[in-house]
Amino acid sequence: MRIFTGSIIMLATASLSMAQTTPQVGAAAPEVTLPSNEGKPISLTDYRGKWVVLYFYPKDFTSGCTSEAQSFQRDLPKFNKADAVILGVSVDNSQSHKNFCAKERLNFKLLADTDAKISEAYGSVKEYNGAKLSARNTFIINPEGKIARVFTGVKPQTHSEEVLQALAELKKS
């Protein structure tokens, strides 16, 4: 019982510290410059003037991550119509992202955060068996480069629709 209680306290503490480092709505989005699935570095500033959906996910080729990526791909025409760019981020390398994009026919960029520094800057890191992974969180960044909406602990199958709805609301205000 003592070990179980200690584990719960550790998990609560880890969640609390992650929540404290997650950028808040209205804050400037931490800069991102990472290699993409195409091998070229991509910066968040490359998309200034556009809405950006920056979504973090744990691992290429896993069921939840594949489902989430497929949902974003399915809705890509709607995001394009809303003048929004989708950028996925995980700790996988560029080659893994390239293979994942090819297999799943993804037409948006995936960024390789192999040292998890960008994931950390966005409060989107979790540990699994001693390895750092990106946590499943999403940030909508407005055309001025500020955080407009934060989603944590998302459901991969329905998340794309949730983001589209939030984007439509944000663009109205």
Model-derived regions: residue spans:
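Thiol-/selenol-based redox modules, centered on thioredoxin-like
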Residues: 133-173
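Short loop/turn microsegments at loop-to-beta-strand junctions
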Residues: 29-30, 51, 135-137
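Structural micro-motif
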Residues: 106-108, 125-128, 132-139
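A short beta-strand-turn-helix
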Residues: 23, 32-51
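Structural microenvironment flanking redox-active thiols in thiol-disulfide oxidoreductases
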Residues: 64-106, 114-118
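N-proximal helix/coil linker or "cap" segments that precede and/or mark the start of modular domains
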Residues: 3-31
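Short active-site neighborhood of thiol/selenol oxidoreductases, capturing the structured segment around
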Residues: 45-66
